[in-house]
Amino acid sequence: MIVEPKFRGFICTTSHPIGCKKNVENQIEYVKENGKIEGAKRVLVLGASTGYGLASAIVASEACDAEVLGVSFEREAKGKRTASAGWYNIESLKKFVEGEGKKFISVNGDAFSNEVKSEVIDLIKENMGKVDLVIYSLAAPKRKDPVSGEVYSSCLKTVGAPFTSKTLDFHTGEIQDITINPATEEEIEGTRKVMGGEDWMLWIEALKEANVLENGVKTIAYSYIGPEVTYPIYREGTIGRAKNDLEKTAGEITKVLKSLNGEGYISVNKALVTQASSAIPIVSLYISILYKVMKEKGTHEGCIEQIYRMFKELYEGNLNLDSENRIRIDDLEMAEDVQKAIEEIWPQITSENVFELSDAEDFKKEFFKLFGFGLEGVDYSEDVDITTV
């Protein structure tokens, strides 16, 4: 069938298999051009199908020549409904890696569940022995507590007081004022349960108990801080509370891994167009301005550039750590001259000048690319088989 983008709000409900494959190939190409990294050899990536998790799986496999086990929860094609972009991404990467004669194991299931943890541990024992790097990059709207069975939901709200600011509807290019209401205590706790560090710790404890962690193992979870303009909705909101919990967990994990000389790290990454960030009010406008400023300065990076740099710093022993022991690969975003330029543009921006003062057009293009649309070298008028890549 011929696949075209279809939308429900900020969610694209279709994905293009050949476009997703091309997107993965472009990232692989970047890594190959930049050379090998002497690093991890057996890697578990939790949340391996999109964004930073996908980039981590690609860098591990292609730069480090590591065996990779990737866990994701994606939708296969059914009837006339395409698979999710993540499903095509993982299939594309798996085919490519196996074509090179390397190992890539994928598990499609709920990483929050005990069943998937057990399945992954068995697969590590059978195929890899032990892993020396665990990447934690899960993003989900809900999580079922594996002990109590209670289902928790995450939400995107402020804490304490409502907050009004500008946001961008990137479909229309309109700048609108938006008010975000404060969360209840229940919503704050729900977001922490889904997006905090609890499940990361459960994974590390289960892997350690099963004796599938290598001596000197490292584990990294991804976070974001950003500038003050986004604080009320992000860092000081429900998501920020969850990220604080995630960051606190890194130190606790280092204690758990002490007997293995292991370490838990948080990597604070750059703001990028992802399925998650495009739905966050205010952040979409901030990213559009950020992209324009960083491109003009020649410092712009996407997921793959960020993660390649992080792996290189991690394994070459020159990590950029802050006072709280967090890896800072958001350093180019948070550079004083970049943030000063954004602060100057922010109050001036309107629906009339948004395409001139920001990179709103590119935000839209990048968003479409997440689902395999708008990539060079893909004929979108062709009939495609939506069940495979």
From Swiss-Prot:
Pathway: Lipid metabolism; fatty acid biosynthesis. Substrate binds at residue 224. The keyword Flavoprotein does not apply. Its EC number is 1.3.1.44. InterPro entries: Eno_Rdtase_FAD-bd_dom (IPR024906), Enoyl-CoA_Rdtase_cat_dom (IPR024910), FabV-like_NADH_b (IPR050048), NAD(P)-bd_dom_sf (IPR036291), Trans-2-enoyl-CoA_reductase (IPR010758). Keywords: Fatty acid biosynthesis, Fatty acid metabolism, Lipid biosynthesis, Lipid metabolism, NAD, Oxidoreductase. It comes from the Bacteria. PANTHER family: ENOYL-[ACYL-CARRIER-PROTEIN] REDUCTASE [NADH] (PTHR37480:SF1). Involved in the fatty acid synthesis (FAS II). Catalyzes the reduction of a carbon-carbon double bond in an enoyl moiety that is covalently linked to a coenzyme A (CoA). This is Trans-2-enoyl-CoA reductase [NADH]. It comes from Clostridium perfringens (strain SM101 / Type A). The lineage of its organism: Bacteria, Bacillati, Bacillota, Clostridia, Eubacteriales.
